[in-house]
Amino acid sequence: MSTIIVYASSNGNTKAVAEYIASKTGGEAVAVSAAKEKDLSSYDTVVIGGRVWAGGVPKDLVEYVKANKDVIAQKNSAFYVCCMYKGEKGQKQCDRLAAEFGIAKHAFFNKGKKLVQDDPGAIDGFIASL
């Protein structure tokens, strides 16, 4: 199974999660700015990762997903966000953003870099769902 993780990160949290997922799946973590060069049709699984700021994900990630929505819809796809919220508030935010992207499998992570270093169990659970 070939996996690509396309992410948008500003403080490194989303990038850390993307790289962790790539290391566990044998996949490739690619910043959205470089993802335009990738042919998504050559991957079995497409994971989209974004950071949340002011209730939304970066515009370039939204544009990327919209431009590739037909290919993403044909793939095993998943979405994650790194956000400041925990619990129900974080889940609701993630649910809303995943619905906007039309991706059913999704998860949210708080403090991605710290999570990867100290307790990646939640990320491992997300990976298992792929």
Language-model features: where?
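FMN-binding flavodoxin-like domain, especially the glycine-rich phosphate-binding loop
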Residues: 3, 9, 13-16, 22-28, ...
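A short glycine-rich beta-strand->turn/loop micro-motif centered on a GG-aromatic cluster
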Residues: 29-36
